[in-house]
């Protein structure tokens, strides 16, 4: 990754076991579709309490908004309870480049 992210978005869901694989496939598709619009990648993970998280990196808030507007949400997502996303403005970034 050449540029450092100016925004980190943390998305959270509760997903029933029978929908996890379909949800993961849809998340992968969405992440790849956002890349040409400025998305810097994402990580999908499961916490100990069963909540699923995606941590997505963006150059800035405006790029994220434009990317979501450009890609739309025409494909349905598998059933999941979506929790409020958390948006972070990085102060110090020591992740590998």
Report residues per predicted region.
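Short acidic, gly/pro-rich beta-turn/loop elements at beta-sheet edges
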Residues: 21-23, 64-66, 95
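Short, well-ordered beta-strand segments in beta-rich or mixed alpha/beta enzyme
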Residues: 7-14, 41-71
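Short, surface-exposed ligand-recognition loops at beta-strand->loop->(often short) alpha-helix junctions
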Residues: 14-25
